[in-house]
Curated annotation (Swiss-Prot):
Organism expressing this protein natively: Pasteurella multocida (strain Pm70)
Xref: PROSITE patterns: PSI_RSU (PS01149), S4 (PS50889)
Official protein name in the record: Ribosomal small subunit pseudouridine synthase A
All copies of domain S4 RNA-binding, residue ranges: 1-68
CDD domains: PseudoU_synth_RsuA (cd02553), S4 (cd00165)
Amino acid sequence: MRLDKFLAENTGLTRSQANKVLKQSAVTVNGHVEKNGAQKVSQTDEICLEGEHLPWVSAGQYLMLYKPQGYVCSHEDGDYPTIYQFFDYPLAGKLHSAGRLDVDTTGLVLLTDDGKWSHRITSPKHHCEKTYLVTLADPVESHYQQACAEGMLLRGEKTPTKPATLEILDDYNVNLTISEGRYHQVKRMFAALGNKVVGLHRWKIGQIELDDRLAEGEYRSLSAEEIATFNK
């Protein structure tokens, strides 16, 4: 890999900014100042910027995060902290979430630097299922299951929701599996049923389940088997 490309990918600098930094003698490769952006480097080289070691961040990052309440899934937000604060730089700048969660929703978020892979999760044509544990303000009523299975017309929408699966756990808790990602869909579905969501936790995307060994704010790499479920 070219040195200027490495700097751009691992520091957040643009390629032109990386070359300016090189001309300022701010970069060393294996202890020697290097000004040539075209210089080839590999993972065996020790590269430093202004004396600080720059780790290699390999392509092909696939992670699951246990998102806590109170965090947004965007890189920047003026009101709330972002989930990218849980990742070290420069990894945080390379990742994007494959589907977001609202600020007050907890649970599974998949993150990657592979746009094609995440597209298989977020694109409506792939009908990726997501399962949520939903806590309701009022008791569950028996007709909810049929209403979800048949689809319902949400306020402001012209087409009904696609069939969804509702599993009743107890009087106030259900698992809801949907294959769409409409704006605030889960909350709006239960509002249409005359109820209110007071707790929302996503625990499954496709075949990938949130690892119960993770605490809120923790993440781990996906296994090869988990990654492959969205490569089919």
